[in-house]
Amino acid sequence: MLSSILIALVAAGSAKAAGGLQGLLTVPETFPNLKACLSEPLTYSCENTTAIQNTCCSPTPGGLVLQTQFWSTYTGLEHKGQLLPKGSWTIHGLWPDNCDGSFEQYCDFSRQFDPAPSPAVLPNGTTIPAWKGPGVDTFVAKFKRVDLLDYMNKYWINQGAPNADFWAHEFSKHATCTSTFDVACYADYKKNQEVVDFFDAVVRAFKMFPTFDMLAAAGIVPSNKTTYTLDQFQTALKTQTGAVPYLGCGKNGTVLQEVWYFNHVLGSEQFGHFKPLDSTTKTSCSSTAGIHYYERTPSSEHEVRILP
């Protein structure tokens, strides 16, 4: 079945049809043409028994893909209109961990757009040069992706700095280490199209894991009074996804702050099918104390969903 989908995607990509196949399939014009992948064996990342020959077709070596999210209660820039989306967690990123759980970062300085790299120095002692050029939001605007920018400004929110700085950090630190976003994967490459491509992929993955709704389905909602157990959180999310994600907590493990969904991917991160896996990282949340899932400051969030 996936082969049929890939053929359709290739056809749509070749035609550069903004509306897809007679409107049935939408493929962003930034996505690469993946005809070469049709001859590659289909296997989930990190589950291949032979070496991946075309790393544009499967994230290699970073095949343990984490879709990560934050639960923040304020932005610090409310006075500038930078608000959190009501009824939703926010995007952190899409990370290409290696199959053994290790990871690379800032893999291509020629595509380093982070104005404040973190870390500023790599483990080997190399200093990461800070980006002094335009924000990555201008790259998205250049491709006329108003729809994408609008979504990112609603759901991919920074704390204490402009949203675009956060997006630049995530691309520079993580996407440059993800083989399916390599410039070499684009036969008719246009400058910065892989940046837009990555943002599309991040949004696509985020939509697969609606954390707020999955928790609410189990009766777990933000509260300044009620606490929940780690088991309640884990069970609620496993029931919906089939796997136990990483839950991150602050305040000695008693305040829920983030979630990481671990996956293997069949195909590229752009087109691929994500298969949820149990977290390979131990939770930082308490297994004994009650865990707070705090309400947001009312002035820090706004309605972004289309209500009936």
Regions found by a protein language model. Name each.
Residues 72-74, 96-97, 101, 178, ...:
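Solvent-exposed loop/turn segments at secondary-structure junctions
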Residues 85-90, 99-141:
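Active-site-surrounding "flap" and adjacent substrate/cofactor-binding loops of secreted or lumenal enzymes
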Residues 18-85, 89-90, 94:
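N-terminal regions that are enriched for targeting/export leaders
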Residues 44-48, 53-56, 64-67, 114-117, ...:
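Extracellular/mature segments of secreted proteins
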Residues 11, 31, 40, 49-51, ...:
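Processing junctions and N-termini across compartments
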Residues 36-38, 45-47, 55-58, 98-100, ...:
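Sequence contexts marking disulfide-bonded cysteines in secreted/extracellular proteins
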Residues 144-308:
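C-terminal, well-folded lobe of enzymatic/effector domains
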Residues 1-23, 308:
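Fungal secretory targeting signals
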